[in-house]
Swiss-Prot record:
Span list, region CRS2 binding: 554-576
Stretch forming the signal peptide: none
Protein name: CRS2-associated factor 1, chloroplastic
Subunit structure: Interacts with CRS2 and RNA. Part of large ribonucleo-protein complexes that include group IIB introns, CRS2 and CAF1.
Gene that encodes it: CAF1
Upper lineage: Eukaryota, Viridiplantae, Streptophyta, Embryophyta, Tracheophyta
């Protein structure tokens, strides 16, 4: 009897166990299946010998240093605004973008320089499309002064040249920009031109590249049929709208007549002719941007590495002043950054959602326009520092204490004397203000003191003795005298107090004399009386001679009338000492005043035409008569439902001489016609 073998367990590791190896031929067959070729074998083209198609050129671009001659190739020039192209007979040097070129000289080039205007001007092989053949049919050149017939079919509408003023003739042979523009436009003409293009969908869009070279021809294409070209700017180019308007007028030759946000209205000129326009060659491809200096340095000038690191850490904790939207209008961004620098030395702008290149272009523009120093572009934010040599753009405060203190620079004994005189006058003014706020003064005593004030020991002096006050308050250094009338200005209230008739030599000490001083000092003019006196004075303009006692007499008269009529309440010193009594009397006095305004002398409207009836009344009477003559309506109540139902009584006979308008039915109208 055969017994089964017991399974033996191996104590070797899997790497030490021996496995049978297959032959090499079998291994190849299992791992790699041999498949016949499906198609003919493709042959590679022979590699060209031109450097433009080499592997190095197709890979990572090498930095080509710029020669010292400033002309790397024929017609190509490296300037402080990038790379420019110069052609014979051109009015200016061409650039790919006239507004978005960085204001820095390139450090190196990324490709060999060439002229991007076509095969004739390009030293490299032509890689673009084959140019279209010229048309055999010679089309007449478009002339703006020779318009097509108005009823001709298949012709787009064309605006005529102009507008021309009365007596003005068009200039056909206009060459210069001033001759093409003609006379300046009036406000009515500008509003009419803008209104005609405001809702037009035919516009030129300007994006992150700004005003490019090929847009010049597009603007002339718009001017071919319309007087105004509407340009809509969005994105990075809107930061410096003034530069865009300047470049448009300089390169194209028109006139910006209106600008609102990112929309520009460019007028072609009164004598513009499309046939005599300047023709520019088109750029057939975009040149590669050169290498510019780094925008952000690790350690900005004037800082240590630790200070720069601490400033970046502190700047990332600041809230951003604004968030820029994609394809938005950033015309106010420069002013916002400048205002923010008035409050803090670091400013952060949120650029989340924008392209990385747009964020860096915005930072480069702010660096030149604000100006400022860029610290970081991390976390899609622009972090800026105002710099160590920053100066505030706000004007200094003229009324501040520091400015006044700087202006008051005196020397020697003269300064001490001036300060003494000014101190005396200021003490008098403080005494006047304290006396005016004194509550306890009697009406009879005030009248007596006013009558006797001319005989008191207060001798009035001119303002010649106190010139220091005029110097310290910033008033003109001309010293007024008592003979010259004082000029009053609401912006300079010190002139009211410093009347030549109000300056005192001695300061009274008792209470009665202080009240007299108060009454005498209240002769300051108010705006209404001064205006009335200016109108009466025909000899002088802007000067007013102050009267002494007219205003105080009128004030006392009004106060006396108020007391007699019960509209004013006078309390004695004993009554003022008790606060409860003052409260009770004030409450009782408040309740005694009528709640509504009482007008004693009210004007009554006199009816000049009493016998003539009013037109409105006649119209209303006529409407009432028509309503009475209309068909009556009876309200019948349903007992079950309880709701009212309106029914018309048709059994009533109509009057034969009354014709109702819009109230007859068909059967009733037939009865009347029969």
């Amino acid at each position: 009897m055969a017994t089964a073998r017991l399974p033996s367990r191996s104590f070797l590791s899997p790497a030490q166990q021996s496995y049978p190896r297959l032959p090499a031929s079998v291994r190849l067959c299992l791992s790699h299946h041999e498949q016949p070729p499906t198609g003919p074998k493709r042959h590679r083209r022979a590699a060209t010998s031109h450097p433009a198609f080499s592997a190095a050129a197709r890979g990572r671009a090498k930095k080509i240093p710029i020669a010292d001659t400033d002309e790397p190739a024929a017609g190509v020039r490296v300037t402080d605004r990038g790379i420019s192209y110069r052609l014979d007979g051109a009015p200016f040097e061409f650039q790919y973008s006239y507004t978005e070129a960085p204001r820095a000289r390139p450090v190196a080039l990324r490709e060999a320089p060439f002229m991007p205007f076509g095969p004739e001007a390009t030293p490299r092989p032509w890689t673009g499309r084959k140019p279209l053949p010229k048309s055999r049919k010679e089309l007449p050149e478009f002339d703006s002064f020779v318009l097509p017939a108005p009823g001709k079919k298949g012709v787009k509408p064309v605006q005529s040249p102009g507008p021309f003023l009365a007596g003005m003739e068009p200039r056909y042979q206009s060459v210069s920009r001033e001759d093409i523009l003609g006379e300046p436009l009036t406000k009515e003409e500008v509003s009419e031109l803008v209104k005609g293009s405001l809702k037009s969908k035919r516009q030129l869009n300007m994006g992150r590249d700004g005003l490019t070279h090929n847009m010049l021809e597009n603007i002339h294409s718009h001017w071919k049929r319309k007087r105004v070209c509407k340009i809509k700017c969005k994105g990075v180019c809107t930061i410096d709208m003034d530069n865009i308007c300047h470049q448009l007028e300089e390169k194209v030759g028109g006139k910006v007549i209106h600008r609102q946000g990112g929309v520009i209205f460019l007028f072609r000129g009164r004598n513009y002719n499309y046939r005599t326009r300047p023709c520019f060659p088109l750029m057939l491809w975009k040149p590669v941007a050169p290498v510019y200096p780094r925008l952000v340095t690790k350690v900005p000038g004037g800082l240590t590495p630790d200070e720069a690191t601490e400033m970046r850490t502190r700047g990332h904790q600041l809230p951003p002043i604004c968030k820029l939207g994609k394809n938005g209008v950033y015309a106010n961004l420069v002013n916002q950054v400048r205002e923010a620098f008035e409050a803090c030395d670091l400013v952060r702008v949120d650029c989340s959602g924008l392209n990385k290149s747009d964020c860096r272009k915005i930072g480069a523009k702010l660096k030149d326009l604000v100006p400022c120093i860029l610290l970081s572009f991390e976390f899609e934010h622009i972090l800026m520092w105002r710099g160590s040599d920053w100066k505030s753009s706000l004007p200094p405060l003229e009324n501040s204490y520091e400015v006044t203190k700087v202006q008051e620079s005196f020397s020697g004994k003269e300064s001490n004397e001036k300060v003494t005189h000014s101190g005396n006058v200021l003490a008098q003014i403080e005494l006047v203000s304290a006396a005016t706020s004194h509550k306890n003064w009697n009406l009879d005593e005030g009248q007596e003191k006013f009558k006797d004030s001319t005989d008191s020991d207060m001798v009035l002096n001119s303002a010649k003795d106190v010139p220091a006050l005029f110097h310290s308050t910033g008033i003109s250094r001309t010293e007024p005298s008592a003979d010259i009338p004082l000029e009053y200005s609401p912006l300079n209230p010190v002139c009211d107090i410093m009347d030549p008739s109000l300056n005192c030599r001695s300061i009274p000490t008792n209470n009665c004399e202080s009240r007299a001083l108060v009454e005498k000092s209240e002769h300051c003019p108010d705006d209404y009386n001064l205006e009335m006196k200016r109108k009466r004075n025909d000899g002088t303009k802007g000067t007013v001679v102050l009267n002494s006692g007219s205003k105080v007499e009128g004030l006392l008269c009004l106060l006396e009338q108020a007391i007699h009529s019960g509209r004013a309440l006078v309390l004695s010193e004993d009554e003022l000492a008790d606060s409860d009594l003052v409260y009770e009397k004030s409450v009782a006095f408040t309740k005694s005043i009528p709640r509504r305004l009482v007008f004693e002398n009210t004007r009554r409207k006199s009816s000049a035409r009493r016998n003539v009836p009013d037109n409105h009344a006649r119209t209303k009477t006529h409407l009432v008569e028509n309503k009475m003559l209309s068909s009556p309506v009876e309200n019948k109540f349903i007992v079950n439902g309880g709701s009212a139902m309106q029914t018309i009584d048709h059994g009533q006979e109509f009057l034969s001489d009354v014709v109702h308008q819009g109230t007859l039915r068909v059967d009733e109208l037939a009865k009347l016609l029969a």
